[in-house]
Amino acid sequence: MSAKKASQPMLNTTGSLQEGEMGKMFHGKCLRIVSPESPAKLYCCYGVIMVLSVAVVALSVALSVKMTPQISTINTYAACPRNWIGVGNKCFYFSEYASNWTFSQTFCKAQEAELARFDTEEELNFLSRYKGSFDYWIGLHRESSEHPWKWTDNTQYNYSLSIRGVERYAYLNDIGISSARVYADKRWSCSKLNSYSLQCKTPFSPM
């Protein structure tokens, strides 16, 4: 009996040791499954990191495109020569002295221009407003009262504003356009196309 009783604690101790070893083994397996070092877990983590990285890059690109100003190129005309005034694509000159129509046209020719020509209502309004109280020769003439009015380049005058009088040379006054003889002394206005254009880059943000 004593031998049996003595052997029982030893058996219990051995069983406990075996149970402890098995517990450690299962615990280690569980840790390996849960541990981030397992291949499945690592692949999952890498996948999440890649998705987040792509999302961050895409968001950064979208924000940079939205906030970066876009450049729009607009054609504008360069400054006119000194003492000339720019309107649209033309430059206009207003004399401070009076002379006849022929001399006035010769002066404008020397400036690589012609006696003033208007092609739009804006240009006509500008000429009428800027001339003040003085009369100014413009580039309209005709062979006789029976012939149509023409510009200095011989293109026909087609504007709706009529020209008063029966003379051959036109000038701008307070009531519109009138005609006078060639030797009458009046101030004059020259005009020329401004062929020099600049590209002006203006930034704007997309909506």
From Swiss-Prot:
<feature type="domain" description="C-type lectin">
    <location>
        <begin position="87"/>
        <end position="198"/>
    </location>
</feature>
<keyword id="KW-0812">Transmembrane</keyword>
<dbReference type="InterPro" id="IPR001304">
    <property type="entry name" value="C-type_lectin-like"/>
</dbReference>
<feature type="modified residue" description="Phosphoserine">
    <location>
        <position position="16"/>
    </location>
</feature>
<comment type="function">
    <text>Receptor for KLRB1B that protects target cells against natural killer cell-mediated lysis.</text>
</comment>
<dbReference type="InterPro" id="IPR050828">
    <property type="entry name" value="C-type_lectin/matrix_domain"/>
</dbReference>
<feature type="glycosylation site" description="N-linked (GlcNAc...) asparagine">
    <location>
        <position position="100"/>
    </location>
</feature>
<keyword id="KW-0675">Receptor</keyword>
<keyword id="KW-0597">Phosphoprotein</keyword>
<dbReference type="InterPro" id="IPR033992">
    <property type="entry name" value="NKR-like_CTLD"/>
</dbReference>
<dbReference type="GO" id="GO:0030246">
    <property type="term" value="F:carbohydrate binding"/>
</dbReference>
<keyword id="KW-1003">Cell membrane</keyword>
<dbReference type="InterPro" id="IPR016186">
    <property type="entry name" value="C-type_lectin-like/link_sf"/>
</dbReference>
<dbReference type="GO" id="GO:0009897">
    <property type="term" value="C:external side of plasma membrane"/>
</dbReference>
<feature type="topological domain" description="Cytoplasmic">
    <location>
        <begin position="1"/>
        <end position="44"/>
    </location>
</feature>
<dbReference type="Pfam" id="PF00059">
    <property type="entry name" value="Lectin_C"/>
</dbReference>
<dbReference type="GO" id="GO:0046703">
    <property type="term" value="F:natural killer cell lectin-like receptor binding"/>
</dbReference>
<keyword id="KW-0472">Membrane</keyword>
<keyword id="KW-0430">Lectin</keyword>
<feature type="modified residue" description="Phosphoserine">
    <location>
        <position position="7"/>
    </location>
</feature>
<keyword id="KW-0325">Glycoprotein</keyword>
<feature type="transmembrane region" description="Helical; Signal-anchor for type II membrane protein">
    <location>
        <begin position="45"/>
        <end position="65"/>
    </location>
</feature>
<keyword id="KW-0735">Signal-anchor</keyword>
<feature type="topological domain" description="Extracellular">
    <location>
        <begin position="66"/>
        <end position="207"/>
    </location>
</feature>
<dbReference type="InterPro" id="IPR016187">
    <property type="entry name" value="CTDL_fold"/>
</dbReference>
<protein>
    <recommendedName>
        <fullName>C-type lectin domain family 2 member D11</fullName>
    </recommendedName>
</protein>
<keyword id="KW-1133">Transmembrane helix</keyword>
